[in-house]
Amino acid sequence: MGRRSRGRRLPQQQQQQQRPGSAEDGAEGGGKRNETGWEGGYPEIVKENKLFEHYYQELKIVPEGEWEQFMEALREPLPATLRITGYKSHAKEILHCLKNKYFKELEDLEVDGQKVEVPQPLSWYPEELAWHTNLSRKILRKSPQLEKFHQFLVSETESGNISRQEAVSMIPPLLLNAQPHHKILDMCAAPGSKTTQLIEMLHADMTVPFPEGFVIANDVDNKRCYLLVHQAKRLSSPCIMVVNHDAACLPRLQMDVNGRKEVLFYDRILCDVPCSGDGTMRKNIDVWKKWTTLNSLQLHGLQLRIATRGAEQLVEGGRMVYSTCSLNPIEDEAVIASLLEKSEGALELADVSSELPGLKWMPGLTQWKVMTRDGQWFPAWDDVPQGRHTQIRPTMFPPKDPESLQAMHLERCLRILPHHQNTGGFFVAVLVKKSPMPWNRRPPKPQGEPADRRGPVQPSPEDPTAQSPPDPAVLGSKPDAVMSDAEAVERAEGLENDGSKRDGVCGPPPSKKMKLFGFKEDPFVFIPEDDPLFPPIQKFYALDPSFPKMNLLTRTTEGKKRQLYMVSKELRNVLLNNSERMKVINTGIKVWCRNNSGEEFDCAFRLAQEGIYTLYPFINSRIITVSIEDVKILLTQENPFFRKLSSETYNQAKDMAKGSVVLKYEPDPTKPDTLQCPIVLCGWRGKASIRTFVPKNERLHYLRMMGLEVLAEKKKKEGAVATNENAASPGAPGDEVGAEQEAEQPASLELPMAGDPASDPAEVPMGSDPAEVPTGSDPARDPAEVPTGMTWWRLAHPGEQAAGASPKARPASDLCAAC
């Protein structure tokens, strides 16, 4: 909505400027500009929809006596919500910084004569890691008093330490209760805010670089997949894979288990389906004028197919969360009831009422009706005329049998209403799989019938989208005996793929190869064990023998390998066994980057900051332990000489050969006022100096955690004159004023950009290619991170094209990350 509005604004403004008349005429005709925008031609959307009110009042989704509060809440702007992400130790430091610095500065602050409301924690989110505030984006950007807080939010969001996420969208991952060993599927993942929550749960223990579990994040929209990649990259996890498929027909994947291929079933599945979004009216005001019941009627079938496919891929005992940002029972309880009915007891709704203390919710509906967009009601399927059968389906109604309805326990679904805790509207249902789905049940063999002589048939790699239940006429009609889902899938695929004639009936035609749409991705090529590229790396960094070198991969089959990426062994298993079944957009983290003249330093590859936390536990050489004062110097100065660092650091660095190094800070528990989380940085040991290769936003993050505030670029430009004066007469060494100007206000110096060798030729070997220097996590600087033809701007603006001038990337904090 917002992008389309901006696209139409320019021609209208030009037309208004050409129109003659006074200021008063312009005000009436739409030519006068005020602080909120153009007055004419863009009337505010009236937040009323009689059909909406009639529909939900009739369904009684709101408790008696609360309707007015419900509607008033829908008309109010949605509070801004932020969630602290990342490893737990780092998250605690950010929380400490927020509470003791930024929030305290807001306590007595007034903007335009109004007292600023201090952010408050969400009562139901664990460990106070989620906060909400009524501060609007306009106030944050325009108020000088809030500039530091705004820059903090923007910078920390870019570096992935804070997520601007709608409060209710944080609920589904929490109810999944994912553990580090779980195999997790996110079926409709873009833009990725919930996916990042799941990744954080995998890495709950910071000391384990490779959790046993992984996340496969899928989205049907190819362009939105790249936004999903950008979100996931911030967390630098080797356990995330982004794929591009229709969620309703996700391919069956396989894994090698003890030399035998087995179907991959997931321990946790997040099924956050596309929906009409009428629970987002507070944020997406377009819904007020566009809402009809037709949207729900059209989406119901797709939602049910996606949920069914998810249930098929869930392991027995696993948990699946179905969620929408819609209040309509056609998209909510009707889908769950239909899924439970067709599962014949294989699925059941879990009681999660006690899992999020402090969350206010309403129980799911057990009775509802269907209404057409012209206001006609149908209480049951039998009342629907023949002419409406293509639009209205039997699965949209509650079950007829009262006992079956009661056994479903639809009241265990959670309905979140906006006026209860100042949120958006939301629906969540948690399903647990108790047994195989009914179409996966093995028919009993008649007595005396020999076993199947064909033997086990391996699934065909050319059948990526087969997801329909096997025909009972083929598998048998007596579902008394039950086999596991894996056995059922293997048997069904064996029958499907057997082309021989039986009883005069030909087998099905051979499956066609899966068609891939969107950008053609570079291949994922694992490095063979005998590759001569790895031994110099292993020797230079003294890698531990337990280092999983088989998990290293590149994105090229020809020429020099410029970057090395790493995945967990479980994702390696998935990649190797499903190359023809799925379209992988991205996986793995960058751990090494080639330096063309690196042979002079005994190793052609230098460390990449993106993967340093994954690599560090295996590195036994090239490690320099630094103090917190050293970290401040390394992050605020371009190439500090050894003599500027502490004597302990100098003694470690002076005898070390030139090349890539690890800079490690260990917190001192006896000094609680200092930074209490470990820091690992990658750097370069030059002839007489050390530099760090850390992205700018990550530098700012660490500096803030150490109590230093770096002012914004805008502030530096506005104070250019004062900056030059300060640079001309800096404080003398030991002078407290000079030290404060250097530490508290490093606006007078440019923070060193990650991987900018041009500013220090001595630090980069002669003949090296600047493009080879690691560039942090900015895809615009690393062509290998972005597919051919895909620019950084297109990551931030999926679906848009540049008009005229070169596009400018919009900060990720300005993007919608509510769902």
Language-model-detected regions and their locations in the chain:
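Conserved SAM-binding loop of SAM-dependent methyltransferases across substrates and taxa
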Residues: P191-F210
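Class I S-adenosyl-L-methionine
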Residues: L74, I84-H182, M201, E348-Q376, R412-I416
